[in-house]
Amino acid sequence: MKPHKRKLCYRSVIVGLLALLSFVSYEWSSLVPNANAIPAFARKYGFSCNVCHVPGFPKLNDTGNIFRDQGYQLGTDGDLPTHEGITMGFWPVSMRTTVGYQAASVRTDGKGITTGGFGFTGLDILSFGSLHRDIAFGIVFTPGLGSAGFGTGASDSDLESAFVRLMRLERFVGVKSEPGDYLLNLKVGKFELDVPFSEKRSPTLNSVFAMYHYQPGTPFTSTISGTSTSSYLNPNSFEIGENSPGAEVAGIKKTAATSGYFRYSLAALSTNTFSGPLSGCPPGTTCGTGGRNVNFFGHMTQSFGGYGIVTGHRIGVFGAYGNAPTMVNATCPTCQAVAGSGQPFSRVGVDVSLTFDGQWNLFGAMMRGNDSKNMFVSQGIVNAQNASWNGAFVELDWYPTLLPLFDAPGWLFSYRYDVIRNDRQGDPTFAKNYNNVDSHTFLARYYIHQSSRTDIALHLEYNTYRTVGVGAANVVTPGSGTCAPACGNLLGQTMLAGLDFAF
């Protein structure tokens, strides 16, 4: 199928599904109660999921964010796992998956891959809650499945998150906090970083936040890959969007002057999960990766007139600094890399969230990234230099109380634009604009049912993106980014229509 015909096909499918969603939601709106989702919390406390979520899981509203920041506690005796109101039938575990139809394509240099079919997105088994007063825990397990995804093959099991969080440690140093303030909390384990806006809580399922996962030298792709591309080696595999093992100190305090909240977090992260290529590996040896360095990530926010997701506004600053391992352990090549060979990298950014009328949320972030020259020197790149780039995204969410025309509650509409712009490549033979990214994501969700037990939503998502100059067909010298007349762009798009449910 020719590219322009394929685009018309995608658009026709999207228009048809939107019309179907509108009709179905209109018919069901008179039958379904307006109950607006880890359902385990709703079961525990006996309230509907809309107490903690905007009209649609998994995005948290102001109350839900505060509940999370306070260690999944309301501040009552009902928080305790031994409370008499919690029956033996309560199990603090939820499961979530999405079933439906997905179509995806990716093309580079006039050649590409197209997939499509019915399937599911995998399975998340989630458990969060309280072990005792001011002691929280979280576990997310993704089981290995022989037919996971939409025809993409088997998946491996992984413990995506596993942590314990100790709350209100300030009391041990003689500081008495006000009700609702949790000034000093310690989290240990593997967890999502306190990024400006949680990717795990995003309602989009098929499109990542580009700046959270961007790596200089590696062509950006989303959902599927497999086309021939050009790249250069970079030992730094750090992504702020990936869960990391470490320890985090964090706190939240009400600020009367702004009628909002001040939040902070500082995490120390181990590099044993780094998977970048290392120099010094003997031929024929499967060398170890990772390392024993400690990297840091921090985030501070101040909100005004609320938490800044449903009411009020919020501003923040965040950053990461660390050293990426670059050489194998000469004494034990199959062991983890040595700490002393690490080379520095940094990420610095700002974020903002604006709300209007309790229905609109405009939010976004900008980040500056830099990987040091010696990372690329370690890979044998001639005339290596620092790799520097800027990333950003902006998203508009609209959750109307009643959708105009159809007079139906329970809708969520989103649009997000992701952008990456490179200033300099670690390998100077690659063009400045190599791996620049423009990504557009459109989302419509209708919430069929949300209660204290189950959640189900109709989900329609479309993503289209372009990654500049990463083609390989016109490369003059193998291993370089010099093309004649130019390197081709990578073009990708994905459409997902399905039912997203949790229980």
Language-model segments: residues:
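Short sequence motifs at beta-strands and strand-loop junctions characteristic
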Residues: T115-G119, A154-D158, F238-G241, G290-R292, ...
